[in-house]
């Protein structure tokens, strides 16, 4: 774009590494796709396109092309101009949001460790760089960027597959103003993996924040929080893994504290957050021993520090960990009894408290970020979905089941929108198309989430949890039996002795049902809630706001039902946006650069459906748009379509495509949409559009400079002031302002222009407040033309195809001559009453002086007499009679108040307006550098002369009496009281908390291999076994019989909207010949009038 020289990390002088867009591959097979990705990966090109879909391969190293130079390179550039990059996709989202006024979202998918979180960071960073804004906007940008290290510290952890694995899902909405400035945001978080707080698998870590705190805390913090080395804590030493390659926990701790500061968390609350994290670590070191079948705390000394950090009594903590209060009902009476727990139950209670504390702390941090970015109303947004990837471990439990279910839903969205919906659209629009087969994973989603006929796995699980009385393995075995009965015959389900198998789109996964029911119940006992509500720290009490006094009614919600609802809500949110896709691929399990595992990549290529995606994109169309939206976006390309096309929408689209010389085989016309085949053709349209805007921007600049130089409204402003002189107080901030006229920008508002006459000039247009019979304020648009006053409102359509949409409605149209007068107060308020024949209008506008002055001028021109103006502090206006309700009058009384803002008080049929004193009634505007002499206003739009007509004819070859001259169209457009223990617990006490022993089988790493593809893989192979013939091109239209035609002898530029423009030698189809000399014809799909003496018949 432009002549500016571009530099890039991929120079055009070096060898081409594979193909940038895999639609161009000569062979479409999984082998060819994987080979192209490998070639580019080995040459350090990690991004590749499939049409508009971006494929990203995790390089496991920092790449050099994410600097400010690349941001400048991709900003505003078309996709084809530069090599594939995540910045190109982000820029496309950002520009489409502003141009099409539509919310956008990007769905980042891939298995764990494929690079999804890093991709989300680059998207946020790019948007922060390219969007403008002042100090407030910069603050929002800082929060958006700093939310990443904070949420990663508390929500990410090292797993076997990924050193920085997201153990929660998030959907980050960046909200924008209409000018494209990020001025707000919102985070939705899903399914934090709470179990990781109390248990980790081998070679994994707990959440990053624990290790950051232990490494980065100051000496004072270590003393106050009783911090030791990680191997001292039971909640950290089970996996015997404390360090991560390439991770500096001490440095990251500083970033986490800085992020909390930016987000607005006060230092005192930051200290309490860290105190809570340390308290959870110390809580985990409380162990239990058996004492006559009951649990007893093994070392009472270990109670002191967690109780101190949590602000609770150590005796109550011991009591709640080893006993539980249970309510029983007998004969209509209820009583509470204390039940002593055994060792297993006590350990479960301790872990439940730790998980509950951490989960509520995480929710607090997310809410703190949302509060810092909150804005009163939503305008535009870009959503970034960064959610846990599909994962398979040696032992897969309830968390993996939920994670893989959400990924299954995301795969379904991709199938619905890129494979299924696209092909169905071609059929509906009448585009010739040969269907392409693919595996639809909806059958797997139904297996998991169906409610009835047959019930899905989640429904069976909820049913077992609602009726279970046994705990532990008893309920889990009941679940397994019921699953076998409900879905045992499903082709994507198998059961085994300790669990079940689901044939996911990404392969077969074996789930161990042990703990499924307990984790699905997700209940925090009321004893523990009561315990935390006794904390001396208000912050901790705030995390437990439950009211436990009332009776509990209804079945409590389960973790499974929550994640199912969240997943479906997420899908609904994504479907309301224009989606973009990033498909992340993990090249190896070693996490090393340039290590390529062919089988692993081919498996991902297959289950991600890349081959089918390429085939649909290759045989299909890169771009499709409804006729009306296409015309709206590209209307500026031709004079005939700007500001709007007045003929048939289909013909308007064809006219635009012909105007840019697009080849007919590059597009097809559907019944309601235009389909453009290649991206290059679309880029052509965008380039021409930008050049047009550039030219018009220069014209606007010239007009603005001329406006500033002339200051033509100085005299008009003084005339308006004379109307109110010695009659009404003036406002200080408005007496010297310039008059603009059109404050609504009617040139760009066809929905408002439709109520005006075809050539009706606009003197004034503004959004005002109208007060009804009950003095209820309603927004209206007030438009003044030389003949009429228009009041336009908005209503929701109740019938028809546009049902539910809000449309503009003409509420009132009053002829200037029908006005009886205008009433105003003597104070500095903005109210006025338009007195009419039927009923009056009580309005409020900050530009009342400008409106009243123009209204007086137009009234005098139409009636040859001045408009009656009334100035009084007691006014009345008549209201329209409705039904049985009386019409009558309403009174408005103005009184002296305080300040410049009016205070309204309604009492029956009277409104009292109080406002402070303004400038004296004798105030006049100050003349600032007005040019001498009255500025001249053009009364007619400029015209372009046509070639000289034949002798005896007037301009444009028409007798002077044949047609009237063009009418003017003139639109003015603007602009603790507990004492701490004497020291940290001794190391000897912690020595009893040794890592748990592991059976030899747990060291098996076969789960890291590429998973068995299962039934989903077999169905994919069956569905794509035969390659269909790609859809044929656009059928050749039948030749149309021609009527009489003529050839242009001279160039003619139309002087009105119903006239044709043409160049020399263009052939026009004659529709009608009129004796007046004006003929009617058709050219480029548009009909209009033209002078007959400018053409010759052929």
Swiss-Prot record:
| Keywords annotated in UniProt | Actin-binding, ATP-binding, Calmodulin-binding, Deafness, Disease variant, Motor protein, Myosin, Non-syndromic deafness, Nucleotide-binding, Phosphoprotein, SH3 domain
One GO CC annotation: actin cytoskeleton
Domain named Myosin motor: residues: 17-690
Region described as Disordered: 913-1009, 1021-1044
Q: Which residues form a coiled coil?
A: none
Residue ranges with Basic residues bias: 924-937
Start and end residues of each SH3 domain: 1041-1098
Pfam families to which the protein is assigned, alphabetical: Myosin_head, Myosin_TH1, SH3_1
The record's section on PANTHER family has:
MYOSIN (PTHR13140), UNCONVENTIONAL MYOSIN-IF (PTHR13140:SF663)
Stated role: Myosins are actin-based motor molecules with ATPase activity. Unconventional myosins serve in intracellular movements. Their highly divergent tails are presumed to bind to membranous compartments, which would be moved relative to actin filaments.
Entry protein name: Unconventional myosin-If
Say which species the protein is native to.
Answer: Homo sapiens (Human)
Read off the lineage from the record.
Eukaryota, Metazoa, Chordata, Craniata, Vertebrata
* Gene name of the record: MYO1F
């Amino acid at each position: 774009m432009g002549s500016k020289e571009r530099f890039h990390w991929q120079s055009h002088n070096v060898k081409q590494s594979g193909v940038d867009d895999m639609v161009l591959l000569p062979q479409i097979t999984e082998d060819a796709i994987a080979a192209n990705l490998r070639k580019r990966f080995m040459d350090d090109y990690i991004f590749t396109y499939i049409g508009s879909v971006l494929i990203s391969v995790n390089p496991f190293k920092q790449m050099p092309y994410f600097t400010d130079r690349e941001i400048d390179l991709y900003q505003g550039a078309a996709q084809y101009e530069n090599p594939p990059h995540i910045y190109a996709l982000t820029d496309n989202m950002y520009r489409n949001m502003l141009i099409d006024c539509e919310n956008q979202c990007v769905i980042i998918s891939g298995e764990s460790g494929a690079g999804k979180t890093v991709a989300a960071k680059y998207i946020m960073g790019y948007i922060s760089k390219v969007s403008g804004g002042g100090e407030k906007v910069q603050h929002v940008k800082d929060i958006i960027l700093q939310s990443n290290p904070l949420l990663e510290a508390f929500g990410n952890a090292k797993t076997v597959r990924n050193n920085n694995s997201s153990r929660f899902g998030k959907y980050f909405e960046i909200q924008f103003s209409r000018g494209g400035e990020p001025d707000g945001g919102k985070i939705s978080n899903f399914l934090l993996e709470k179990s990781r707080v109390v248990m980790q698998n081998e070679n994994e870590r707990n959440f990053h924040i624990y290790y950051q705190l232990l490494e980065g805390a100051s000496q004072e913090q270590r003393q106050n929080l009783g911090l030791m080395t990680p191997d001292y804590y039971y909640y950290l030493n089970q996996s015997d893994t404390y360090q991560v390659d390439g991770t500096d926990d001490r440095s990251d701790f500083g970033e986490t504290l800085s992020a909390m500061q930016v987000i607005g968390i006060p230092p005192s609350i930051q200290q309490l957050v860290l105190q809570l994290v340390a308290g959870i670590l110390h809580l985990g070191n409380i162990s239990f021993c058996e004492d006559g079948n009951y649990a007893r705390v093994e070392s009472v000394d270990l109670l002191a520090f967690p109780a101190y950090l949590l602000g609770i009594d150590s005796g109550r903590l011991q009591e709640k960990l080893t006993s539980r209060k249970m309510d029983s009902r007998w004969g209509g009476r209820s009583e509470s009894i204390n039940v002593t727990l055994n060792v297993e139950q006590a350990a479960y209670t301790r872990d439940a408290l730790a998980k509950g504390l951490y989960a509520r702390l995480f929710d607090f941090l997310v809410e703190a970020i949302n509060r810092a970015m909150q804005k009163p109303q939503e305008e535009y947004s870009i959503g970034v979905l960064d959610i846990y990837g599909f994962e398979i471990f040696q032992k897969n439990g309830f968390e993996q089941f939920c994670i893989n279910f959400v990924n299954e839903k995301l795969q379904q969205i991709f199938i619905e929108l890129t494979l299924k919906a696209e092909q169905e659209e071609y059929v509906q629009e009448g585009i010739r198309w040969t269907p392409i087969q693919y595996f639809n994973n909806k059958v797997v989603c139904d297996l998991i989430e169906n409610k009835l006929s047959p019930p899905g796995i989640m429904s069976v699980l909820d049913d077992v949890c609602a009726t279970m009385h046994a705990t532990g393995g008893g309920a889990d075995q009941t679940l397994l039996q019921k699953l076998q009965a409900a879905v045992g015959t499903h082709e994507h389900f198998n059961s085994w002795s300790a669990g079940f198998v689901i044939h996911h789109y990404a392969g077969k996964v074996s789930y161990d049902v042990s703990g499924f029911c307990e984790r699905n119940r997700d209940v925090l006992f009321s004893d523990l809630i009561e315990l935390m509500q006794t904390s001396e720290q208000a912050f901790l009490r705030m995390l437990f706001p439950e009211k436990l006094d009332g009776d509990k009614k209804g079945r409590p919600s389960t973790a499974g039902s929550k994640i199912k609802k969240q997943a479906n809500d997420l899908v609904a949110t994504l479907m309301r946006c224009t989606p973009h896709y990033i498909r992340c691929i993990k090249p190896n399990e070693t996490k090393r650069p340039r290590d390529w595992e062919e089988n692993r990549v081919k498996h991902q290529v297959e289950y991600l459906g890349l081959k089918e995606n390429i085939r649909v994109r290759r045989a299909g169309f890169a771009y499709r748009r409804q006729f009306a939206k296409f015309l709206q976006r590209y209307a500026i390309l031709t004079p005939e379509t700007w500001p709007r096309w007045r003929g048939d929408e289909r013909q308007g689209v064809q006219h635009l495509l012909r105007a840019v010389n697009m080849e007919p085989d590059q597009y097809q016309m559907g019944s309601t949409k235009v389909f453009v085949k290649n991206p290059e053709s679309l880029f052509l349209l965008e380039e021409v559009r930008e050049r047009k805007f550039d030219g018009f921007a220069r014209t606007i600049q010239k007009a603005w400079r001329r406006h500033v130089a002339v200051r033509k409204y100085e005299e008009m402003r003084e005339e308006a002031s004379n109307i109110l002189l010695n009659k009404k107080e003036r406002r200080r901030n408005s007496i010297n302002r310039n008059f603009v006229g059109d404050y609504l920008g009617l040139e760009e508002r066809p929905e408002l222009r439709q109520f005006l006459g075809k050539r009706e000039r606009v003197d004034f247009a503004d959004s005002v407040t109208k007060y009804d019979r009950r003095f209820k304020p309603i927004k209206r648009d007030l438009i003044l033309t030389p003949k009429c006053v228009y009041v336009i409102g908005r209503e929701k359509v109740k019938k028809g195809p546009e049902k539910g949409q809000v449309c503009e409605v003409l509420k009132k149209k009053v002829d200037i001559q029908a006005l009886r007068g205008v009433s105003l107060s003597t104070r500095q308020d903005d109210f006025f009453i338009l007195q009419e024949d039927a009923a009056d209008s009580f309005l409020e506008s900050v530009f009342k002086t400008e409106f009243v002055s123009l209204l007086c001028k137009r009234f005098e021109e139409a009636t040859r007499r001045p408009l009656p103006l009334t100035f009084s502090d007691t006014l009345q206006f008549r209201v329209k009679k409705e039904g049985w309700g009386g019409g009558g009058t309403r009174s408005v009384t103005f009184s002296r108040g305080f300040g410049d803002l009016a205070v309204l008080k309604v009492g029956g049929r009277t409104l009292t307006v109080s406002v402070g004193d303004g400038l004296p009634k004798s105030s006049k505007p100050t003349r600032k550098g007005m040019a001498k002499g009255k500025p001249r206003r053009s009364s007619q739009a400029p015209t372009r002369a046509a070639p000289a007509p034949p002798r005896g004819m007037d301009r444009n070859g028409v007798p002077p009496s044949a047609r009237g001259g063009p009418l003017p169209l003139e639109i003015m457009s603007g602009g603790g009281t507990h004492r701490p223990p004497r020291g940290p617990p001794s190391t000897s006490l912690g020595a009893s908390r040794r890592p748990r022993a592991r059976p030899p089988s747990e060291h098996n790493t076969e789960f890291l291999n590429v998973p068995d593809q299962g039934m989903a893989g077999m169905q994919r192979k069956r569905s794509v076994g035969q390659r269909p013939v790609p859809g044929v091109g656009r059928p050749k239209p039948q030749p149309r019989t021609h009527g009489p035609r003529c050839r242009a002898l001279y160039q003619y530029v139309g002087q009105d909207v119903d006239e044709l423009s043409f160049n020399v030698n263009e052939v026009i189809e004659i529709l009608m010949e009129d004796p007046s000399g004006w003929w009617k014809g058709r050219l480029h799909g548009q009909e209009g009038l033209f002078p007959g003496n400018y053409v010759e018949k052929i």
